[in-house]
Amino acid sequence: MHAWDPPASLSRALPLASSVLMLLLSCLWLLGAGPSLRLAPELLTEPWQVHRLLTHALGHTALPGLLLSLLLLPTLGWWQECHLGTLRFLHNSAVLALATGLLAVLLAGLGLSSAAGGCGYMPVHLAMLAGQSYYPGWPQRTLPPWLLPWLLLALTLLLSSEPPFLQLLCGLLAGLAYAAGAFRWLELSERRLQVLQEGVLCRTLAGCWPLKLLPTPGSLGELPVTYPAGVRPATPRPPYLASSSSWPHTDGFAQLPPGLGPGQLTWKNSERDLDWAGPSFASATPMWAALDEQMLQEGIQASLLDVSVQGSQNTLWSPKPSVSSLRLQQLQHMGFPTEQAAVALAATGRVEGAVSLLVEGLVDTEALVTEERSGPAHCKDTGVS
């Protein structure tokens, strides 16, 4: 979930849900099933017609509306499915389609009859686009992400008369409500997603070609794994993102990037590691909240380890190797600046001691920390080393 470009898995197989939706919309159009799926409030009183609240998104009665929906599925739908996972993409699409139908029926009951009576997948496209509160990898100096669904709404009105404007607006409002957390109680839990993805059907579809079920990024089944020291994975992995449970059991410098010794890690390296890991935590699913306490405890344990440095005798002006991105991130979450937090960690070697220095205001922003333990950090109070 880090770029607009399709990930590598897309070049090997197509996303299952979006591709099947394209086939389904085309088949229903050829069969002429659009009128029987349109959102008709007067028919919803019959028990067998309640399905229209959901299936109104699958029917089309106008060719321009169908072509626009089909065009957006391989462009927008594939990207969303790759970054949400197939199961979460299907779940979100169904929830937003149902919310759009209910909102349209509500407006029709209030006297706005044009809010219902149509069909088409465009309201779901608008809802999914508006429901993304932030777009990872969105290029800088371009249109703001919140403007995209409104531009798509205007484009739809220019190119097609189906569905009606109020029904499209209902889809957009449903997406905005989703982004605001109105449907959070309907979200699939990480445990539920894991159980579904470990099922026989999902595992079979995940290995199919050319259509493939994509796992949910960041789910328990997608957690990073730890590689033995000296063994590099086939695809590059960012430093400091290997499993934190390996810290107490592996060499202290096994997490450094290839070619960098303990004394060659500069402030820019640490900041670049934090920048890489930042979007991953920002867009993480609730699974990270459940593991937050465990990661904090392991980070504190790792900070208490006294790593002896075997290197040259010359003084190197760089942060201590024990200053890791995770500990810096813990202090950042507490509201401390990055530079001062790193200096305090290098001076004390402990998270608790760093917090004490920062709270008392003893850390100088211009301080440099040597690799040797006896080399004091330059603080405002010369008595602190």
UniProtKB/Swiss-Prot annotation:
<feature type="transmembrane region" description="Helical">
    <location>
        <begin position="93"/>
        <end position="113"/>
    </location>
</feature>
<keyword id="KW-0472">Membrane</keyword>
<dbReference type="GO" id="GO:0002673">
    <property type="term" value="P:regulation of acute inflammatory response"/>
</dbReference>
<keyword id="KW-0812">Transmembrane</keyword>
<dbReference type="InterPro" id="IPR022764">
    <property type="entry name" value="Peptidase_S54_rhomboid_dom"/>
</dbReference>
<dbReference type="GO" id="GO:0045732">
    <property type="term" value="P:positive regulation of protein catabolic process"/>
</dbReference>
<feature type="transmembrane region" description="Helical">
    <location>
        <begin position="58"/>
        <end position="78"/>
    </location>
</feature>
<protein>
    <recommendedName>
        <fullName>Rhomboid domain-containing protein 3</fullName>
    </recommendedName>
</protein>
<dbReference type="GO" id="GO:0004252">
    <property type="term" value="F:serine-type endopeptidase activity"/>
</dbReference>
<feature type="transmembrane region" description="Helical">
    <location>
        <begin position="146"/>
        <end position="166"/>
    </location>
</feature>
<dbReference type="GO" id="GO:0009410">
    <property type="term" value="P:response to xenobiotic stimulus"/>
</dbReference>
<dbReference type="Pfam" id="PF00627">
    <property type="entry name" value="UBA"/>
</dbReference>
<feature type="transmembrane region" description="Helical">
    <location>
        <begin position="168"/>
        <end position="188"/>
    </location>
</feature>
<keyword id="KW-1133">Transmembrane helix</keyword>
<dbReference type="InterPro" id="IPR015940">
    <property type="entry name" value="UBA"/>
</dbReference>
<dbReference type="GO" id="GO:0032815">
    <property type="term" value="P:negative regulation of natural killer cell activation"/>
</dbReference>
<dbReference type="GO" id="GO:0050708">
    <property type="term" value="P:regulation of protein secretion"/>
</dbReference>
<feature type="transmembrane region" description="Helical">
    <location>
        <begin position="13"/>
        <end position="33"/>
    </location>
</feature>
<dbReference type="GO" id="GO:0001889">
    <property type="term" value="P:liver development"/>
</dbReference>
<dbReference type="GO" id="GO:0000165">
    <property type="term" value="P:MAPK cascade"/>
</dbReference>
<dbReference type="GO" id="GO:0016020">
    <property type="term" value="C:membrane"/>
</dbReference>
<feature type="domain" description="UBA">
    <location>
        <begin position="322"/>
        <end position="361"/>
    </location>
</feature>
<dbReference type="InterPro" id="IPR009060">
    <property type="entry name" value="UBA-like_sf"/>
</dbReference>
<dbReference type="InterPro" id="IPR035952">
    <property type="entry name" value="Rhomboid-like_sf"/>
</dbReference>
<dbReference type="Pfam" id="PF01694">
    <property type="entry name" value="Rhomboid"/>
</dbReference>
